[in-house]
Regions:
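Short beta-strand segments enriched in small/hydrophobic residues
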Residues: 31-41
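Anion-binding alpha/beta catalytic cores of soluble intermediary-metabolism enzymes, centered on
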Residues: 92-156
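Short beta-strand elements in bilobed, periplasmic/extracellular small-molecule ligand-binding domains
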Residues: 56-70, 185-188
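Rossmann-fold NAD(P)-binding glycine/threonine-rich loop
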Residues: 104-125, 230-282
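Positively charged, low-complexity intrinsically disordered leader regions
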Residues: 1-28
C-alpha cells in the first residue's frame, strides 16, 4: 500500500467546479465571486490567501481580497464584513485574527448562504441536522472526499472512523458529515484516555493535532486509511504532518496522505466547491 494521490482527487473536485461554472448563463448572470477578509499581518495567512486567489482565478471565480489593519476596532471590522457580504456570493474571514477582536461575533455576521467556510453557528447547526443547504468547512469536506475516493463505492455504512481533533474546522463538522453518511465516528482529543485503543481498531484514522510526526506505528494497524490534516515543521524545518509516514509504512500495510501535497491542496479545492454551493443558494 502507498501514499494517497490527493492531486488526482483535487483535479476531480476542480473539474466538477469547472463543469458547474460552464452551466452559468453569463449573458444574464455574473461570475461567482468570493471575498476574503484578512486582518493583520500573519505570514501563514498570506500564503493560504495567495493559494486561494490563484486557484479561484485559474478556474473563473472572481476574488476580492480585503486587507484590514491589525489594530482595527471591533465595530469597524463588523461594519466592513456586513458591507462586503452584500457585494459578493461568498465571503470568508481568514483566520487567525488579532486577539482583541471577537472572532465569534465577526463570523456570525456572515449570512448563512454566503458563509463559504461553514463556520457560523447557523451553518454548524444545519450540518448537524443534515440540512441540504448546509455549507461544510473545506478541510472536513476534503477528508470526506478522500474517504469516498478510497472506498470507491461511496458507501460509508459500517465504516469505523476515529478523528483526533475536535475543532470547528475539522473534528466537529467531520463527525456530523460522516455520521450523516452512516459512518460510525469516534471523536478524540487531548483529554482522551488510551487513544491507541481507538485508532488501532478503526478503518479510517484522521489526525489534526499539530504535532510533527507524533503518530508512529504504535497507533495503527494493517489495512487502515490514514488521513493526516496536520501541517507542521520537523526538527530540520521541513514540512511534515502529524504522522511519521515512513515509520508507519515500514511496519504496516496502510494508505496514508502525504504532507505536503495532501489534505492542504484539497482544502483549497473544496473551498471553490463551496463558492459554487453559495452561488447556487442565491441564484
Amino acid at each position: 500500500m502507498a501514499k494517497i494521490d490527493c492531486k488526482a482527487i483535487r483535479e476531480e473536485i476542480l473539474q466538477h467546479v469547472r463543469d458547474e461554472l460552464e452551466k452559468i448563463d453569463y449573458e444574464t448572470e455574473l461570475a461567482p465571486s468570493l471575498a476574503i477578509i484578512t486582518i493583520g499581518d500573519d505570514d501563514a495567512s498570506k500564503v493560504y490567501v495567495r493559494n486561494k486567489i490563484k486557484t479561484a482565478n485559474s478556474i473563473g471565480i472572481e476574488v476580492k481580497h480585503v486587507q484590514l489593519d491589525g489594530d482595527i476596532e471591533q465595530k469597524e471590522a463588523e461594519k466592513i464584513i456586513i458591507e462586503e457580504s452584500i457585494e459578493t456570493d461568498a465571503i470568508m474571514l481568514q483566520l487567525p485574527i488579532p486577539k482583541h477582536l471577537d472572532e465569534k461575533i465577526l463570523i456570525n455576521l456572515i449570512p448563512q448562504c454566503k458563509d463559504v467556510d461553514g463556520l457560523t453557528d447557523l451553518n454548524m447547526g444545519m450540518l448537524v441536522n443534515n440540512h441540504p443547504y448546509a455549507i461544510v468547512p473545506a478541510t472536513a469536506m476534503g477528508v470526506y472526499k478522500i474517504i469516498n475516493y478510497m472506498l470507491e463505492t461511496g458507501d460509508l455504512t459500517g465504516v469505523d472512523v476515529t478523528v483526533v481533533n475536535r475543532s470547528q474546522l475539522i473534528g466537529k463538522p467531520l463527525q456530523a458529515l460522516l455520521t450523516n453518511h452512516n459512518a460510525t465516528v469516534t471523536l478524540c482529543h487531548s483529554k482522551t484516555d488510551n487513544l491507541q485503543n481507538h485508532t488501532c481498531r478503526s478503518h479510517v484514522v484522521v489526525t489534526g493535532i499539530g504535532q510533527p510526526k507524533y503518530f508512529d506505528s504504535y497507533y495503527f494497524s494493517d489495512y487502515q486509511l490514514i488521513i493526516d490534516c496536520g501541517m507542521n515543521r520537523d526538527e530540520n524545518g521541513k514540512l511534515c504532518g502529524d504522522v511519521d509516514v515512513d515509520e508507519v509504512q515500514q511496519e504496516f500495510k496502510v494508505h496514508v496522505t502525504p504532507t505536503p501535497g495532501g489534505t492542504g491542496i484539497l482544502t483549497t479545492a473544496c473551498l471553490m466547491l463551496s463558492v459554487i454551493h453559495c452561488y447556487n443558494l442565491q441564484h
